[in-house]
From Swiss-Prot:
This is Bifunctional protein HldE. CDD domains: RfaE_like. It comes from Shigella sonnei (strain Ss046). It comes from the Bacteria. One of its GO terms (biological process) is ADP-L-glycero-beta-D-manno-heptose biosynthetic process. The modification N6-acetyllysine is found at K179. In the N-terminal section; belongs to the carbohydrate kinase PfkB family. Residues 1-318 are annotated as: Ribokinase. One of its GO terms (cellular component) is cytosol. The active site is at D264.
Length: 477
């Protein structure tokens, strides 16, 4: 099955925050200055790139979404260069010009792939009247699906709490890339996206994943957040939401060259995906895939729709994610060459709950790779009745593919996955519940191939049917 990207072209996102211009001067250096013990660089290349909140807006526009950028600049060459660069990539800029301040500019001098010095041209915008920013937000709220507040502690978000309240009143989700340790100022936001260092600076050092979850959930409660996404570098990212099981997503980066701007890519893809009408879980899946692409590039970068599609499709050469049967067979063959034990299970997985997560984690522990085969919508309807599935196949597969325990997800149209299992022939076939091994679809084929069949227990008290009944009862009540 091919994963469909969000309809980015219908997504409108406004980014408000600290905009800046990144300037790079490159050139050879072969001598020391006679004036001081410093290298002399003969500049032969000059590059200018939007930075800070402007880079977030570029990431949104690169997906084909409608990106609007609001921030504070001076009236100078840097502001004009910034506006031109952003217009070239279809970002609509609506800057507030402050004649008493320069546009924030960071100039880096590089030679032989080494940064020799960075020169910052800036004065904090604290104290500047925020009303023009509020007016621009108010004017846009009826036509956007998400508001991103990009905080680099330069003063543009001095009135961040008022901005959050404006968006909440209009029912627009607010996503914030936080700065500093005062998370009180972000109270009421829909989603905060701190990296692990920023998170631990607020809650303290976390030695285990369980501590991250426990302290993250407390932070959500303390600051009335709807969700928290902790980006954890090579350990992937963790999505925490009240009343839901934590969603830990392993990194999808194949190689890491440069993490510069990866956080901007993550929040940009999150916002564009939510604004396109997708769920937060789906948004995190796409953002995680995009981060895996962008860290494989040098310098601040963006991700194109084609790059994102290639990443989330989990093609055989990337070794993860949602796959077609043919792609899965290639991936399994490659895994076997590496001597890996392949485990396979199946199910509907309609409303993912803690019992599912626990079961899949247990199944994954039985080997090196876990395949999850998922009933198609038609198959689910025949199995569960006309009211099911609640979530369509594509959404179910995307969420499963985001789980740390799951390597590959594939769908099947039949009532049982027997044909699919016979084609894959896993080393271990796993099923949850009170089945007898010989009753499990595909067991005969696996045994005939020398494989094993194992029945695992489901966690007590967890049931999709019970969840649906409770929702229906709550609606009636």
């Amino acid at each position: 099955m091919k994963v469909t990207l969000p309809e980015f072209e219908r997504a409108g996102v406004m980014v408000v925050g600290d905009v800046m211009l990144d300037r790079y001067w490159y050139g050879p250096s072969s001598r020391i200055s006679p004036e001081a013990p410093v290298p002399v660089v003969k500049v032969n290349t000059i590059e200018e790139r939007p930075g800070g909140a402007a880079n977030v807006a570029m990431n949104i526009a690169s997906l084909g979404a409608n990106a609007r950028l609001v921030g504070l600049t001076g009236i100078d060459d840097a502001a004009r260069a910034l506006s031109k660069s952003l217009a070239d990539v279809n970002v609509k800029c609506d800057f507030v010009s402050v004649p008493t301040h320069p546009t924030i500019t960071k100039l880096r001098v590089l030679s032989r792939n080494q940064q020799l010095i960075r020169l910052d041209f800036e004065e904090g915008f604290e104290g500047v009247d925020p009303q023009p920013l509020h007016e621009r937000i108010n004017q846009a709220l009826s036509s956007i699906g998400a508001l991103v507040l990009s905080d680099y502690a330069k003063g543009a978000l001095a009135s961040v709490q008022q901005m959050i309240q404006l968006a909440r009143k209009a029912g627009v989700p607010v996503l914030i890339d936080p700065k500093g340790t005062d998370f009180e100022r972000y109270r009421g936001a829909t989603l905060l996206t701190p990296n692990l260092s920023e998170f631990e600076a607020v809650v303290g050092k976390c030695k285990t994943e369980e501590e991250i979850v426990e302290r993250g959930m407390k932070l959500i409660a303390d600051y009335e957040l709807s969700a928290l996404l902790v980006t954890r570098s090579e350990q992937g990212m963790s999505l925490l939401q009240p009343g839901k099981a934590p969603l830990h997503m392993p990194t999808q980066a194949q190689e890491v060259y440069d993490v510069t701007g990866a956080g901007d890519t993550v929040i940009g893809v999150l916002a564009a995906t939510l604004a396109a009408g997708n769920s937060l879980e789906e948004a995190c899946f796409f953002a995680n895939a995009a981060a895996g692409v962008v860290v494989g590039k040098l310098g601040t970068s963006t991700v194109s729709p084609i790059e994102l599609e290639n990443a989330v499709r989990g093609r055989a050469d990337t070794g993860f994610g949602v796959m077609t049967e043919e792609e899965l067979k290639l991936a399994v063959a490659a895994a076997r060459k590496r001597g890996e034990k392949v485990v396979m299970t199946n199910g509907v997985f309609d409303i993912l709950h803690a019992g599912h997560v626990s079961y899949l984690a247990n199944a994954r522990k039985q080997g090196d790779r876990l395949i999850v085969a998922v009933n198609s919508d038609a198959s689910t309807k025949r199995l569960k009745g006309d009211s099911r599935p609640v979530n369509p196949l594509e959404q179910r597969m995307i969420v499963l593919g985001a789980l740390e325990a799951v390597d590959w997800v594939v769908s099947f149209e039949e009532d049982t996955p027997q044909r699919l299992i016979a084609g894959i022939l896993p080393d271990l076939l796993v099923k949850g519940g009170d089945y007898k091994p010989e009753e499990i679809a595909g067991s005969k084929e696996v045994w005939a191939n020398g494989g094993e069949v194992l029945v695992l227990n489901f966690e007590d008290g967890c049931s999709t049917t019970n969840i649906i009944k409770k929702i229906q009862q709550d609606k009636k009540g």
